[in-house]
């Protein structure tokens, strides 16, 4: 087996809307930090060996300057371990290094949730693992509906305890199928009467957004319109209470 290696195509925790195509995937990332130009949500896209793509979305507790610093540290660790082939193994390595660095710093415990996935452009397999992160949504183009991904997958966030092991699952993506990863800022927004959107409400909003857009779907339009829907649910102007990042993937081959 050839050595596995990855090259970062894009990573950041700043306000952005970017699109990339790789390994038979179309990807779109839209990020809106709370209270500034940079926040605690880190998204990253890698091109790897053997027609493989890897994505990572990390959500550092808090927002603003402090969370932004933690996100930069997670980004640094990603570079150190980006060539680990196994998805769950990548999380375990990140967690051990992040937790040990926590022990060397003063101040409150820094925790970070993470979801990472690796897509094989040849087989269509998408392997994924969670570190206490909100479950991604899978859009089945043939069935025209969203499903939650990763039932039964658990795991502590990065920074809680060393030696944590993570489990991974796999799903095959067909032409037109999509993966939607997001930070918890998207599901924890509240309406003007204080009702939280919730994961179920966000899934429904994503389906409503897709049904209202013209076909063939432009992925950037979906991300932008879904974010606008989250903002409309809030029903108020001003800064978000938490950072929001949406990372969408669609199989094109």
At which residue positions do the language-model features occur?
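Conserved catalytic-loop aspartate of Hanks-type protein kinases
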Residues: 184
């Amino acid at each position: 087996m050839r050595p596995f290696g990855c090259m970062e195509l894009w990573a950041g925790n700043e306000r952005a809307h970017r699109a990339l195509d790789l390994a038979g995937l179309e990807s779109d990332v839209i990020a809106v930090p709370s209270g500034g130009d940079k926040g605690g949500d880190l998204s990253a896209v890698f091109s790897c060996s053997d027609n493989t793509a890897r994505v990572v979305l990390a959500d550092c507790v808090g927002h603003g300057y402090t969370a932004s610093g933690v996100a930069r540290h997670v980004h640094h660790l990603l570079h150190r371990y980006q060539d680990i082939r196994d998805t769950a193994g990548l999380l375990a390595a990140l967690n051990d290094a992040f937790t040990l660095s926590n022990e060397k710093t003063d101040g409150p415990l820094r925790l970070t949730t993470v979801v990472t996935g690796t897509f094989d452009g040849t087989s269509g397999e998408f392997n994924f693992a969670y570190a206490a992160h909100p479950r991604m949504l899978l859009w089945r183009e043939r069935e025209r509906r969203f499903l939650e991904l990763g039932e039964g997958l658990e795991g502590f966030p990065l920074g809680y305890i060393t030696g944590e092991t993570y489990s991974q699952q796999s799903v095959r993506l067909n032409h037109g199928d999509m993966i939607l990863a997001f930070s918890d800022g998207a599901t924890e927004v509240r309406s003007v009467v204080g009702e939280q959107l919730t994961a179920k409400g966000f899934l429904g909003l994503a389906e409503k957004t897709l049904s209202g857009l013209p076909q063939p779907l432009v992925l950037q339009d979906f991300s932008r319109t879904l974010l606008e829907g989250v903002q409309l649910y809030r029903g108020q102007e001003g800064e978000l209470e938490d950072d929001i990042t949406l990372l969408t993937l669609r199989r094109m081959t």
